Amino acid sequence: MAKQYDVLFRLLLIGDSGVGKTCLLCRFTDNEFHSSHISTIGVDFKMKTIEVDGIKVRIQIWDTAGQERYQTITKQYYRRAQGIFLVYDISSERSYQHIMKWVSDVDEYAPEGVQKILIGNKADEEQKRQVGREQGQQLAREYGMDFYETSACTNLNIKESFTRLTELVLQAHRKELEGLRTRANHELALAELEEDEGKPEGPANSSKTCWC
């Protein structure tokens, strides 16, 4: 039976409550958009497999609550992330200003070398815009991040941003990938995904390894 994936790793979506993190997740994984969502309580996640440069990548994408009362819970997930989206709402200057706080949390709790992308979401709401595209680009440059404006509503830059963060994580693990490319059946000797943290889409495959 063909392998379902070659590597597995974890991405996080962080940012203020209401910036559209859950909508981004649902659009990418299920190609669905709902204009209203119940605020995430603690954390939730979905899975998706994509192929990048011939590597089948299984991505575990965690959607974290933005409310302050859940911060102690959500920060526990930073330390095992390989990639993080920092999300603000272009129609909310407040959410943009809070990116500095989210970056500080990443610096404190996430592993060194974690890959990051800045997202200005709800780009379809141009008439409500409070944060210019140039502001997002400038902030991303200050923190050394790639930047995308996205819209889960219109599907703008959803695939592109998730694919790019996946590429960045793979590039950061190029040594492991060199072994993977030269020995197609070799499985990376890395920590196994903890099955008790959620319910993947299908039965767990005990032979798979991950970068979590």
UniProtKB/Swiss-Prot annotation:
Gene Ontology cellular component list: endosome membrane; plasma membrane
Cited Pfam families: Ras (PF00071)
Single GO BP term: Rab protein signal transduction
Activity regulation, short description: Regulated by guanine nucleotide exchange factors (GEFs) which promote the exchange of bound GDP for free GTP. Regulated by GTPase activating proteins (GAPs) which increase the GTP hydrolysis activity. Inhibited by GDP dissociation inhibitors (GDIs).
Cofactor: Mg(2+)
Annotated domain remarks: Switch 1, switch 2 and the interswitch regions are characteristic of Rab GTPases and mediate the interactions with Rab downstream effectors. The switch regions undergo conformational changes upon nucleotide binding which drives interaction with specific sets of effector proteins, with most effectors only binding to GTP-bound Rab.
Protein name: Ras-related protein Rab-15
Provenance organism: Bos taurus
Lineage: Eukaryota, Metazoa, Chordata, Craniata, Vertebrata
